[in-house]
Amino acid sequence: MKFVAFRGPLILILFGHVCAAALWCSDVSRKPRVRAITAFVSIDRATYGKQIQDTLAMLRKAKSAFEKGGYEVQTIRITTQPFPQYTRGITKAEALEFFKGLDALSKKEEFLANVGPAMLNDQDDSAVDLLADILVSTDINTSLVIAADDGIHWNAIRAAAKTIKYVEDHSANGVRNFDFAAAAFVPPYTPFYPGSNHNGRGHQFSVGLEGGSFVADVFTESHGDPRIARELLSHKLAEHARSLEAIALQVEKDSGWSYMGLDATPAPGPDSSIGAAIQQFTGTRFGSSGTLTAAAIITDAVRSIPVKRVGYSGLMLPPLEDSVLAQGWSEGAYRIDALLAYSAVCGTGLDAIPLPGDVSQQQLERIIGDVASLAFKWHKPLTARLIPAPGKKAGERTDFDFGITGFPNVILQPLP
């Protein structure tokens, strides 16, 4: 879609010290996309094939409904209850055969699959080896829980670091770490992967957005004024949120599936950079002063929408999914510590972070531990999705291929 920059005037009304946009002008901002319609199911190994087909029938009707409403839909997804619950009593080999079958079905029917987290209990690591083998044997998403209301899960942190190194060594160029997250406080019914999870009866769905270009267009209209930026973004995001919720509630009525809510986190995409949006606001490169303010404005706007919300409801900053963020990473404009600082006001933690292949398990434990500590301190959803590049050192360029056209590679930076 061709981008026509807004050039018209804004009429402002002053209320004391607050300047709010009273005339929203002609709306030239590009629509957010629907990144994911995610269904949550409680599967039975014996009947899962029929369960998946019934779920796909709902998802495809939902996709059609959103498209008729004017929203592009990128993916449909299915998240199961935590996989250790339905692999008890069978051998590891039998479990892997089951997951390979689920993976083959997902490819045939064109949906993304997530089998939920392991180690809900920090003392139970019995499913960790199976989790690692699921990752290297299939294209299924999964996660480990590293912090929750009961505290920081230090055993799970060690298990996550061990898993990342195993997957680095046992999958093609380590790319399967892309579909694994060490997750803290990620709430149920989150539509985004890999942290998506639920532990209930199923028969529910939620919706997640992509919106880098949408945010960039709104920030163009704000001319760098933080008050106007927040008001404009809140107003325009709320308009779309109401429209999306109306469609979702009609799907709920027609299908009998329960709608759990919208995660309006404006995820980036190959042609929809959230890094570019933030630079549009600050007038300088990502990582400079003002970046934290932009992150806070976006998060405040996302959390202000007057609809049912789920998930992170914040901001994603994945260097390996966003060309502008990738360029800044390659230039050393920001590092892991900066992303953790931004996570204090937004989310979603350390997402799609490229690391040198010689990063040690102990270094990974410390990084994941920082994410868990921050999440526990503020009781907020954060994840660590860390992707070491096998055989690559700081200063060298990655050559990842995640199977998604437009995802960038970067120059690796030394660890802090």
State where each predicted segment sits.
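Bacterial N-terminal signal peptides that target proteins for export
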Residues: 1-11
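Bacterial N-terminal signal peptides
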Residues: 9-20
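Anaerobic metallocofactor- and corrinoid-dependent redox/one-carbon enzyme cores
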Residues: 24-416
